[in-house]
Amino acid sequence: MPSRKKAAALRYNEEKENAPKVVAKGEGEVAKNIIKIAELNNLPIKKDEDLIELLSKVELDKEVPEALYKAVAEVFSFIYRTTNKS
C-alpha cells in the first residue's frame, strides 16, 4: 500500500514565540489542501519526508521540540534563500 502524502505548515515569530510552531498538518486530502494554500500564497514548499514524519507527531499550535530545531532551522534557511534571491 503506497504511503499517503503528508504536509505541515510552520510559523515562527521570533518577537512573540520561543520556537517555530506547527500551525497546520495533515495527510491525504488535508495535505493536498495545505500545499495548495501555500502555492496560492506563493509560500515556499520544501519536501523532507523524514522531517514531516516527525512534525506530524507535534500537536497543532505547539512549538516544535528542541530535538527538531536543527532540521527546522534548515527549512527556514531554505525559505530565506528561496525568497531572497536577487
Map each language-model feature to its residues.
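Divalent-cation
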Residues: M1-S86
